[in-house]
């Protein structure tokens, strides 16, 4: 009896395809609470039962957008059934991705540290000359 072999990186490929398809399907939604949404990443469980869809919002309230996307998750999943060629299409769970906010905060902290360092460097040579 032959056993099925696992296809290498299948989970990653399925997640990538879901990301592309969900991004296209979201553009078709008519809900005004869903603004300019970017799908950042998708994480699929090994059994393909659930998928976390991480998104960011350019304009609009992230909480309202998450609520609207989670309400539309059933419609989106049904549409994925028609597009994907897999046995189990995962249940979609939308989560706001704070990576861009954290990156902006870190960038501001780095800029502030560099400005402080430059100010300290300017102050030290003047103090040693006097």
From Swiss-Prot:
Keywords for this protein: Cytoplasm, Ribosome biogenesis
SUPFAM superfamilies with a match to the protein in the record: Ribosome-binding factor A, RbfA
One example GO MF annotation: ribosomal small subunit binding
GO biological process, one term: maturation of SSU-rRNA
Domain of life according to the entry: Bacteria
Location of this chain's protein in the cell: Cytoplasm
GO CC term (a single one): cytosol
InterPro entries: KH_dom-like_a/b, RbfA, RbfA_dom_sf
Any Pfam family hit: RBFA
Quaternary structure note: Monomer. Binds 30S ribosomal subunits, but not 50S ribosomal subunits or 70S ribosomes.
HAMAP family: RbfA
Family: Belongs to the RbfA family.
PANTHER family with a match to the protein in the record: RIBOSOME-BINDING FACTOR A, CHLOROPLASTIC-RELATED
Function as written in the Swiss-Prot or TrEMBL entry: One of several proteins that assist in the late maturation steps of the functional core of the 30S ribosomal subunit. Associates with free 30S ribosomal subunits (but not with 30S subunits that are part of 70S ribosomes or polysomes). Required for efficient processing of 16S rRNA. May interact with the 5'-terminal helix region of 16S rRNA.
Name of the protein: Ribosome-binding factor A
Gene name for this UniProt entry: rbfA
